[in-house]
Regions:
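Active-site and adjacent loop segments of nucleotide-processing enzymes
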Residues: 228-236, 246-248, 269-457
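Charged boundary/loop elements
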Residues: 39-49
């Protein structure tokens, strides 16, 4: 019998708290085995439109699918399922599982995990519905549950697909006819004028009622439906989705948060990106057989929301200027640089698909970089200029035109001397998502300077070995200096190597 999960709360972006259920260690082991079995059964049949909690899929693959398949979209349904994970019906889920799994004991084990309940403030509560977020099997159970919705949407997409291509736009055809006549008469100037007018209107009728497409992408409980068609069609599909959710899955589609948006007028927020549609008619490219065609009209663009950059910059700005982070002053310089690098690298790695990633990240990078320099300057009671002079390292420019000076640090390792500078990689847009990330646990868990000194098992004050150690923080070097000056005794050797911040003692 599984133990009740421990309930903890983590903050959400909107200020509310998200409940998580942390299973006991023994239950985690069993859940992992169950997860692997379920993945082997269901992964081959899951929809290509589902991207959440699946191998080799991510937010990037979901966004790339929207960008590559939804060109010309008029309307977007932004789907929001009210408390999806908390309202999954156990009986419906087990019924869905029984369609593919003919093993009563295995299904009973899953039922026990679902009914195990949770502990909060040492009091047990029963689980009447939902899969607790935080459990190892919860994501795949949610995907299995919502796979029924994926199949429903694939049916909707096939049902509403009409026509092979849009009909020609009448005004465009008239101008094309006039241009051809002008060229035959030798009036090239008039023909060029007609061409300019043609470039400002669509070649195909964007409101063709006989051409319709419906595309659907889901990541966990967030989904979007991209529609080439009328608003009436979008409203009809929205009502059918709400009806299916309520009748078949006992889930509720939020009437307030589920919106229908005209992509020509307003951007859609999905997975942290903003989705918009390009309206440029004049840019042209030449295809593989030499024909000119419009390059961007109607294409889907992914952009970085402006409020994301402003929110990320809050810890590093004060009164509109770069500002130091006081909580990092006590860290060694190499760890300060490492933390700043991790922040900007993480931000870029997530938004690398955005069209404007270079512009937005350059703005972030300026304030972030000088915040790092000011943090080091405060640590060493110095100035920005002196920090750049002391830690500046000349590195080659990306375009090959000379060098540039970036703050960094040189350090020694077993493999030899190495250099760490502030993040200087290219901030260009990435056209396609990267493949599966390789196992990085070794790098994540290797620890910093403090872990190495603790693991050395030696007291830095008296040299005692093989004893329990803890880290003592030395806040201000000047206080130590005053103390030993008053005593008239020399300062011990441990003061200088520890960068004035930490000391390992029994």
């Amino acid at each position: 019998q599984p133990n009740p999960a421990k309930r903890v709360y983590i903050p959400k972006k909107n200020g509310k708290m998200r409940p998580l259920g942390i299973p006991a260690f023994a239950d985690k082991l069993v859940q992992e085995v169950v997860r692997q079995i379920l993945e082997a059964i269901y992964e081959p049949i899951f929809s290509d439109n589902s991207h959440g909690f699946r191998p080799n899929r991510s937010c990037h693959t979901a966004l790339y699918q929207i960008k590559s398949t939804c060109r010309g979209t008029n309307w977007v349904i932004e789907g929001d399922i009210t408390g999806c994970f908390d309202h999954i019906d156990h009986e419906i889920l087990l019924k869905i599982l029984s369609k593919k799994i003919d093993d009563g004991r295995f299904l009973e084990l899953i039922r026990k995990f679902l009914k195990a309940g949770y502990l909060e403030f040492n009091q047990k509560y029963n689980s009447l519905s939902g899969t607790p977020q935080g459990g190892i099997i919860s994501p795949i159970l949610a995907n299995i549950y919502l796979h029924e919705f994926d199949k429903f949407m694939e049916g909707i997409s096939a049902e509403y697909t009409k026509g092979k291509q849009r009909r020609p736009y009448r005004e465009y055809q008239i101008l094309q006819y006039k241009r051809n006549r002008a060229k035959k008469k030798g009036n090239q100037e008039q023909a060029d004028e007609y061409l300019r007018q043609m470039q400002n209107i669509p070649a195909l009728d964007p409101m063709d009622k006989n051409y319709q497409r419906v595309k659907y992408v889901r990541y966990a409980d967030d989904f979007v439906v991209c529609i080439i068609g009328s608003k009436a069609t979008a409203n009809e599909i929205k009502e059918r989705i709400a009806g299916f959710m309520q009748k078949e899955l006992h889930l509720e589609l939020s009437r307030e948060k589920t919106k229908i948006t005209n992509l020509s007028d307003k951007r859609v927020r999905f997975l942290g990106y903003e989705i918009t549609k390009s309206q440029e008619n004049t840019k042209q490219v030449v295809d593989s057989i030499g024909r000119k065609k419009r390059s961007v009209n109607g294409t889907i663009q992914l952009v970085v929301p402006g409020d994301v950059i402003r929110e990320k910059l809050k810890p590093f700005i004060k009164k509109g200027k770069p500002y130091q982070v006081g909580a990092r002053v006590n860290l060694p310089v190499i760890e300060i640089i490492s933390q700043y690098n991790a922040e900007i690298r993480g931000l870029y790695n997530y938004y690398c698909l955005a069209t404007d990633v270079s512009t937005k990240k350059s703005t972030f990078q300026y304030y972030h970089y000088f915040s790092m320099i000011k943090t080091i300057a405060r640590k060493e009671k110095s100035s920005v200029k002196k920090v750049i002079q002391k830690y500046g390292i000349d590195v080659p420019r990306k375009n090959g035109t000379g060098t540039m000076r970036i703050v960094g640090i040189r350090y020694n390792t077993k493999e030899g001397p190495k250099t760490m500078t502030y993040f200087n990689d290219s901030l260009k847009k990435v056209s396609r998502p990267a493949g599966e990330i390789s196992d990085q646990f070794g790098q994540v868990l290797k620890g910093g300077q403090l872990m190495k000194r603790l693991n050395s098992d030696v007291c830095e004050l008296c040299g005692a070995e093989h004893c329990a150690l803890e880290i003592h923080h030395v806040r201000k070097l000047k206080d130590i200096v005053k103390k030993y000056r008053k005593r008239g005794t020399p300062m011990p050797n441990w003061v200088w190597p520890v960068s004035y911040t930490h000391l390992t003692l029994p």
